[in-house]
Amino acid sequence: MAWTAPKITEVPLGAEINSYVCGQKK
């Protein structure tokens, strides 16, 4: 469980930051 927990939170966070940065550039 300890191994999957960080991944579950990391992926959506990374996607959110990615889309946010992309939106800021445009």
From Swiss-Prot:
Pathway: Cofactor biosynthesis; pyrroloquinoline quinone biosynthesis. InterPro entries: PQQ_synth_PqqA. There is a cross-link at E16-Y20 (Pyrroloquinoline quinone (Glu-Tyr)). GO terms for biological process: pyrroloquinoline quinone biosynthetic process. Keywords: PQQ biosynthesis. It holds the Pfam family PqqA. Belongs to the PqqA family. Required for coenzyme pyrroloquinoline quinone (PQQ) biosynthesis. PQQ is probably formed by cross-linking a specific glutamate to a specific tyrosine residue and excising these residues from the peptide. This is Coenzyme PQQ synthesis protein A. It comes from Gluconacetobacter diazotrophicus (strain ATCC 49037 / DSM 5601 / CCUG 37298 / CIP 103539 / LMG 7603 / PAl5).
